[in-house]
């Protein structure tokens, strides 16, 4: 569904530094994930990292965002690459926590945050529900509403890698979700 209504809001700035970590990533060694739609994109499951960056993600998700369950993906979109129009299916997080939820309930359970890890540059874009997120800066935090309902897409037709952090989670525990939906 596309309504051309702004369904996102800038809600803050990531409270820890990312540049030193991102610069060290050897994207050629990063494997494709099981739920990745576009083969050229590279994704790191940040919540699984056993280092200071992973600990910062864990603290941010649990303390600052008050998420009881979550996934956090660092994705690199190379030049010349597009993310086709889609809605979120929440395959990884529902599988990870063994959640059985009807698609119609996803937006009542899950929250999505989109956080660019590099400033917007020529050729980079992200469109959500037909509305562009404009002049983003590295570490801006955008909350996206209804990501299983509203279509979104993005791309990189520029010269530099486009790198983002996406956090999907719930402020309900897995047990509470099981109680509600079983």
Predicted regions and their residues:
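Catalytic core of non-heme Fe(II) oxygenases with the double-stranded beta-helix
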Residues: 65-145
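Small/flexible residues
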Residues: 39, 47, 114, 145, ...
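General structural signal for secondary-structure boundaries
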Residues: 11-15, 94, 118, 170-174
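Residues at beta-strand starts and edge strands
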Residues: 2, 8, 109-111, 161-163
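Non-heme Fe(II)/2-oxoglutarate
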Residues: 1-75, 82
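Catalytic core of Fe(II)/2-oxoglutarate
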Residues: 119-182
